[in-house]
Structures are given as structure tokens and as C-alpha cells.
Regions:
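C-terminal luminal/periplasmic domains and tails of membrane-associated envelope-modifying transferases
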Residues: 3-8, 23-26, 404-412, 418-423, ...
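Arg/Gly-rich low-complexity intrinsically disordered repeat tracts
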Residues: 17-29
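Ser/Thr/Pro-rich low-complexity tandem-repeat tracts
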Residues: 8-19
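Polytopic membrane enzymes that build or remodel cell-surface glycoconjugates and lipids
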Residues: 2-10, 27-462, 472, 482-486, ...
Length: 661
């Protein structure tokens, strides 16, 4: 066979494929044996990625997707994407996935997850085709579908990464068939993939070098006739580069260069099992750089020392593929970009998965046994790490769900201690930021509301680090907040509260959940003329509402500021049973601590929402809710008076009652 498989049986590095079986000659059992790995890879991927389908929009999705609204499909062909990029096909797909008047995240996540699973199946097919070993192919497919280090890519709604990995794998598989069978149809399919990839993402210019690497491997291992046909696949990439460089760019030009630290960071994409193990073992007290170096060296030693002459060439192929696929990110992006963009690890992830799956490609039983144990370890580790990342993204997305639900009511909202990004305290890998970018300051929170509901409203974001610190001490996260300047007890905080219709506070729980709650409002004019009572000469209690919700009471107080309180003055809210025994309390400054009474401005109306949580259910009976103020310096309470001006006992003004049946 001039252009067929002409490998020498005497060469230990040359694959020896069995004769092909026609599908119609296979028995049902043989059919089942063929499709079982594909079914298993798909099922594993569905279980792992099902939660991803429930994610909302985050990061810069409103801009990246929303920019297509004002343009026709034809105009998208000439529109630069995200400042310095040209991705017309990506924009066309993003526009097509908008299925209603407003945007829903589900079609975008379904698109990405579906192509991620398809890519895993295609990797299985490519590996099985090249190496004729179902165990290697299955391991590579499972490792890819669970690849944990680049989860950001398939999890982000506006991402096209899963699709263009599919194009890459189809192109390589098709080219291999074309060279072995001299099939024009497969050459054409490869060219189609090479033409479609660059308009999706600039990583498409790396597909021709990947094909050239495969051509060299086929010449080396399959003894095919020399051919220069691989060079034709550079044509679409060159045309794309001409167009890309001719587009006016408002963003910063890529900082082209070869950098050692960036290479070390990116090496975690191939050394990920060992790099993860280093972090799980707390790095043995070593610096992050030393950990990454040790992980890279250990991974290289393990992969090469466990290879024989028979299995070394496929490993070399996978590693070179990984390096080529990673090279554009390495030479074009500085570490400041890379370390907060783990999605760059995703494009080469199929080659990394192939390299680790390759440890099963051996003739010696003991080597295959070692390889099998290693693959099982990496799969289990990848599964647990992926679940951690998925849970992190779910928590961030649930927070965004709350933003949108609250925001669709319109008006002006002030968000306090809202996350910009957050990550686990336990670093998943030695170098980099392995968290979630929820809502960077480049996007206003109102953008997400308008994008998904069509409601136009306004938001501001501020941080109060002093009030946030106790939550952070108990939280599993490190958090960067929106409005990074500390506005604690400042005029900026007060004026922003005046500007807002509602003030929304983010709670960070021990279990990692993020909850937004309404904490109050301040109005410069009085909207209420009622009176419950007065606390000293500092404030009137104009109104109150009490609502029981399971094991908690929601108490909302309406204060009218009369004169300045002392800096040490604070508020108490008590829950008393029928015998006047204290059974619960919600003491502290107004608006969840944001505004101490000393900050109140005379004549302003302060709505103060509090939540009192009980450790156990309240027993049946009637409960009184009382309020007052005291000086923290000496514990002395202010006198309190009812609406008729009569002084009440113990400085406790009753503002409501609740009955538990």
C-alpha cells in the first residue's frame, strides 16, 4: 500500500492494527463493546457537568454576549470582538443562542457542556484510531471530561472553547485518515475545520502546526510517503492573521515574549495531578514557585521513566501537541493575565489528558498495572477537584441569581461587600488564581439585571472591611469585593445609602453559600407621621414590623433621628417571652452595622431591617419585641418613652408582639 499503513511488524514502536471490521458484520455484543466506552464517558461527563447547566451569567457575559444585539449577522462578520479580538463566528453563534426577548443562560451552558462531552468522545475516537488501544483511548476521554484545571472555559456562557476543541480533534482525526487512505473527503473535512476555527478564536492559528506535528508522527511511525499537503492548512490561518492585524484595536496589543515564569505557571496544565497533590499536602512548607517546579519535574520524570521504546513515541506526540496548543497563550500573555485566566489551560487539555492516558500503553503487565493505578488516582483526584470548582461556581451563580431577582424590581440598589471574585482558602494548585470571577468592576451589576430581564435600574457597590472580617474568618473563601476601597463608617457610605432605594448586604456562610439580604434604607425626608415612642432625645421610633419565618424573626424598625448620639451608643432589640425572660436578641448598629446612631443625620428617616435567629424553635406562646439604646462604654441605657410620653421600664420600648402556636 503506497499510502496506507506500512508499519513494520519488527519495529516495537510501530502500531499493528487489526483488520477493520465492517459495522454490518459485527454481532450485537461486538457493537455493545464498541459503544460502551463512549456511553461511559458521556455518562461520567453528564454527572460531572449537570450542575453547570444551572449556572447563570457571570464575569463579562453581558458585554461579550450583549454586544451582538445591535448588529445583524452580516455586520458581525466585520465587528471586532472584545476590543482586540476578531471572532465573527463566535459572535454569530452567541447571537443565534438568544432564544427570547431577553437572555437566558441555559442555552449557552447547554451548548458548551454538549460540545465538552462531544470533545471527550472525539478524543476517545482519535486516540483509539492512532494507537489502537481502547484502554488508552477510554482513559484519555475520561481524564479530559473531568479535566479540573480549566473548568472556567466550559463553565462560562460566552465561551467557545468546547466547540473549537471539537474542531481540533475532528481535524486531526480526519487528517490521519486522509493520509492513511488518501481520502479527498477527509482532506476537505480537515480544511473545513481549519477554516472555521480561526473565526471562532485566535487559537485557530495553532491548528496547522498541530497537523504538521501529526504529519511528522505519521511519517515516523506509519512510514507513509512524504507529503507537503499539511502546509495547505496554513492558508486559512494566514488569511485570518491578515484580517486580524488590519482591524483597529482599542485594547492593549499582546505582549509577545518568551517568559520563564509564565511557562512555569502554564506547566501546571500538564503536571496537574502532581501539582494538585502538592497543594493538598500543603506544599510541604515550600514556596509556590518551588512547588510548581517540583510538580513539573516530577510529572516529566514519571511520564518518561514509565515509558518503553514501544510507548514513548505516542507520549512524545501528546506532549508536543500540548506544547503547541499552549504556545500562543505563553508567548502572547503576561502572568497578570494568565494567573486569573485558568481557561487558557483548557485548549491544550485534550493533549494533557492523552499524555496521562498514555501510561496504559505498554506491553508489560506490571507497567500497565502501575499505569492503571495511576489513571484511577488521577481520575478520582480530578473528580473531587472538579466538584470543588463546580460548587464554587454554583455558589457564585446563586448569588447572581439573587442579584437579578432583587434587581428586576427596579430602582436604585446599593450592594455592600458584593464579591468581585472569590476562591478557596486552600489553593487548588500552587501558582495562580483558581477561583471564580463573578462580577468584575468592568460590569455594573445592573448590566446583569438588564441583560436577563430587560429591566433598567441602577446599582452601586461599596465595601466595609471591618464588618466583613468576622465572616471572612469563618468562610472557606478569600474574597475580593466590588468597591475595593474601605467605606466603613464614612460619608461615602452614608451618601450612597441616601442615594439608594435599598441597601443589600452579602452574607458569607461557613458552608460557602452567599446570601443577599435587605438591611435598610435612609431617607432625607420623613415619610411616616406615626409614633411608637422615643429613645432619650436621640431618636423617635416611628414604626415597626415583625414577621416570623421558621426559626427566625424579621424585625424592621423605622427611626427618626432627632440629635446626634455618642460614638459609643448602640441599639438593642430583645425578644421576651410571657415571663419577660430574654429568649433572643439582635443588638448592634443600624443597617447591619453600617450606620451607628452617631452617624445619623438629624431629620433623616432610617429604616433598619434586622434578622434574629433562634437556635431551636420557639415554644408556643406570645413574645414581645422591645428596643432601646445604651452606651457601650458603661452599659447605661437611655430612657425610653411611649407615644404618650410616659417613661417605660428598663428603657425597653415595646414595638410589637408575635404569637407562636
Amino acid at each position: 500500500m503506497a499510502d496506507g499503513l506500512a508499519s513494520s511488524p519488527s519495529s516495537p514502536s510501530s502500531p499493528s492494527p487489526p483488520p477493520p471490521l465492517h459495522p454490518f458484520t459485527l454481532s450485537p455484543l461486538q457493537h455493545l463493546k464498541r459503544i460502551t466506552p463512549i456511553i461511559l464517558i458521556t455518562l461520567i461527563g453528564l454527572v460531572a457537568y449537570y450542575p453547570t447547566l444551572t449556572l447563570n451569567f457571570f464575569w463579562e457575559d453581558p458585554f461579550d454576549i450583549g454586544q451582538v444585539d445591535s448588529l445583524s449577522y452580516f455586520q458581525l462578520l466585520t465587528a471586532p470582538n472584545s476590543n482586540s479580538y476578531y471572532r465573527p463566528l463566535a459572535l454569530i453563534i452567541l447571537k443565534a443562542l438568544k432564544l427570547g426577548a431577553n437572555y437566558s443562560a441555559f442555552p449557552y451552558h447547554l451548548f458548551n457542556v454538549a460540545f465538552h462531552l462531544l470533545a471527550a468522545v472525539l478524543l476517545y475516537g482519535l486516540a483509539n484510531h492512532l494507537f489502537k488501544n481502547r484502554a488508552v483511548a477510554f482513559s484519555a476521554g475520561v481524564l479530559f471530561v473531568l479535566y479540573p484545571i480549566g473548568y472556567e472555559a466550559p463553565a462560562r456562557a460566552s465561551s467557545m472553547h468546547s466547540l473549537y476543541i471539537c474542531l481540533t480533534l475532528i481535524a486531526l482525526w480526519s487528517y490521519s485518515i486522509a493520509r492513511q487512505k488518501d481520502s479527498r473527503r477527509h482532506y476537505a473535512l480537515t480544511f473545513l475545520c481549519a477554516a472555521l476555527f480561526p473565526p471562532l478564536h485566535e487559537n485557530g492559528i495553532m491548528l496547522p502546526p498541530l497537523i504538521v506535528v501529526l504529519e511528522i508522527y505519521l511519517l515516523w511511525q506509519y512510514k507513509l510517503k512524504r507529503s507537503f499537503i499539511a502546509l495547505i492548512y496554513f492558508v486559512p490561518a494566514l488569511i485570518f492573521l491578515v484580517i486580524w492585524f488590519s482591524i483597529p484595536k482599542s485594547g492593549e496589543a499582546p505582549a509577545i515574549g518568551v517568559r520563564g515564569f509564565e511557562a512555569l505557571y502554564l506547566s501546571q496544565g500538564i503536571s496537574f495531578p502532581i501539582a494538585r497533590l502538592m497543594s493538598q499536602l500543603n506544599g510541604f512548607g515550600l514556596t509556590a514557585i518551588t512547588q510548581a517546579l517540583m510538580a513539573a519535574a516530577s510529572a516529566a520524570l514519571f511520564l518518561f521513566l514509565t515509558r518503553t521504546r514501544y510507548s514513548l513515541p505516542p507520549l512524545v506526540l501528546a506532549l508536543i501537541w500540548w506544547g503547541v496548543a499552549m504556545s500562543l497563550a505563553w508567548i502572547a500573555r503576561p502572568i497578570e493575565y494568565l494567573e486569573v485566566s485558568p481557561r487558557v489551560m483548557y485548549f491544550p487539555s485534550w493533549a494533557a489528558s492523552l499524555a496521562w492516558g498514555m501510561i496504559l500503553l505498554d506491553k508489560e503487565k506490571w507497567r500497565r498495572a502501575v499505569g492503571g493505578v495511576t489513571v484511577v488516582f488521577v481520575v478520582l483526584q480530578s473528580w473531587t477537584t472538579l466538584q470543588q470548582s463546580t460548587q464554587l461556581y454554583l455558589n457564585g451563580s446563586r448569588w447572581m441569581d439573587q442579584v437579578i431577582t432583587i434587581g428586576k424590581g427596579g430602582g436604585r440598589l446599593l450592594f455592600v461587600n458584593a464579591p468581585d471574585r472569590f476562591m478557596y482558602r486552600e489553593q487548588l494548585y500552587p501558582l495562580g488564581y483558581w477561583g471564580m470571577l463573578v462580577a468584575p468592576v468592568s460590569q455594573d451589576l445592573s448590566d446583569f439585571v438588564r441583560f436577563t430581564t430587560g429591566v433598567t435600574m441602577e446599582t452601586k457597590s461599596l465595601s466595609d472591611f471591618q464588618l466583613m472580617q468576622p465572616m471572612m474568618d469563618a468562610s472557606p473563601y478569600f474574597v475580593n469585593t466590588r468597591g475595593s476601597a474601605n467605606a466603613h463608617a464614612s460619608d461615602v457610605m452614608y451618601d450612597s445609602i441616601l442615594w439608594a432605594d435599598k441597601v443589600m448586604w452579602t452574607d458569607y456562610a461557613r458552608d460557602g453559600s452567599l446570601t443577599i439580604k435587605y438591611v435598610g434604607d435612609v431617607r432625607p425626608t420623613l415619610l411616616t407621621s406615626t409614633l411608637i415612642g422615643r429613645i432619650g432625645d436621640v431618636a423617635d421610633v416611628a414604626g415597626a414590623s415583625v414577621m416570623r419565618d421558621g426559626n427566625l424573626l424579621r424585625v424592621t424598625l423605622l427611626w427618626r433621628s432627632l440629635s446626634a448620639a455618642k460614638p459609643t451608643d448602640t441599639i438593642f432589640v430583645h425578644v421576651l417571652d410571657s415571663s419577660s425572660t430574654l429568649v433572643g436578641q439582635g443588638d448592634g448598629e443600624s443597617l447591619n452595622g453600617l450606620l451607628p446612631p452617631s452617624a445619623w443625620r438629624s431629620g433623616h428617616e432610617i429604616e433598619d431591617a434586622r434578622v434574629i435567629i433562634f437556635d431551636s424553635p420557639l415554644i408556643a406562646g406570645e413574645y414581645r419585641i422591645t428596643v432601646g439604646m445604651y452606651d457601650r462604654a458603661d452599659g447605661k441605657r437611655y430612657k425610653a418613652f411611649d407615644a404618650k410620653g410616659v417613661e417605660v421600664s428598663e428603657g425597653e420600648l415595646e414595638v410589637g408582639r408575635v404569637t407562636v402556636k
